Design a protein with these regions (language model features):
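Secretory/extracellular carbohydrate-interaction modules
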Residues: 60-143
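Bacterial Sec-dependent N-terminal signal peptides
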Residues: 1-22
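Extracellular carbohydrate-recognition regions
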Residues: 19-43
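Extracellular beta-strand elements of beta-rich domains used
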Residues: 27, 211-215
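Short tryptophan-centered beta-strand motifs in secreted/extracellular beta-sheet-rich domains
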Residues: 27, 100-102, 158-178
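Short strand-turn-strand beta-turns centered on an Asx-Gly dipeptide
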Residues: 179-184
């Protein structure tokens, strides 16, 4: 009898693990095979270390450009704003309701420093993203390397200096909702999801540190 109960307990525990409704990535290891880029590329880096993931993109050095322009008398641009993303494949059925919750630290919000989420990621030219800076939030649909759809609205941050944030991406099967620190900042309808690719986006001289991300099947 005791043996039978033990077997039933083991089966029940196994079933509960198999059908777990959430998974939390704490970056103690690269368990979801994020696309790390540790070397200094033309666009930026994405490194997992010390229990967090840090994404850095490059930007124009405006101060040096102004100085060189003044010295030479010729308009001089130093560097360029770059887009950089890193992604994994989320343990979710994206055609069913889900929530993704993540805690991040942003270096700075500015008009030329953008950050956000990529999702429905098929490859480097085909994905959706929510991104924002200090004055606006955008939803973009990328197809074959081109932006083919944009929904944008202005946003007023209560505290532009607050760089520790909680982001949530929620899908109820019909509507996509992007939430920052408990406040809904953009809602998008009629954008079906097909792919489980999910990640983070930076543009310009931006640095984003990700503490954790939780995938929840609703």
């Amino acid at each position: 009898m005791k043996k039978t109960i033990g077997i039933m307990t083991l089966v029940l525990a196994t079933t509960m693990v198999t059908y777990a409704q959430s998974f939390k990535e704490t970056f103690d290891a690269n368990s979801l095979e994020w696309t790390e880029c540790a070397y200094e590329s033309n666009s930026g880096t994405a490194i997992i270390d010390g229990g967090k993931m840090t994404i850095i993109s490059k930007g124009e050095n405006k101060g040096l450009g102004i100085a060189l322009t003044a010295l030479s008398g010729v308009a001089t641009k130093v560097g360029a704003n770059t887009f950089f993303e890193t992604h994994c494949y989320a343990p979710l059925d994206v055609q069913k309701p889900f929530k993704i919750r993540t805690h991040v630290n942003i270096q700075k919000l500015a008009s030329d420093r953008t950050t956000g989420l990529v999702f429905n990621y098929k490859d480097g030219g085909n994905f959706y993203c929510f991104n924002f800076n200090n004055e606006m939030v955008r939803f973009e649909r990328h197809v074959d390397g081109a932006v083919v759809g944009v929904i944008q609205q202005g946003v007023i941050w209560k505290d532009k200096k607050k760089v520790d944030q909680e982001w949530e991406l929620i899908s109820d099967g019909q509507v996509l909702t992007f939430i920052v620190d408990g406040i809904q900042i953009l809602k998008v309808r009629y954008m079906p999801l097909e792919y489980t690719g999910f990640g983070y986006y930076t543009f310009g001289k931006q640095e984003l540190a990700v503490d954790d991300v939780e995938f929840i099947q609703l």
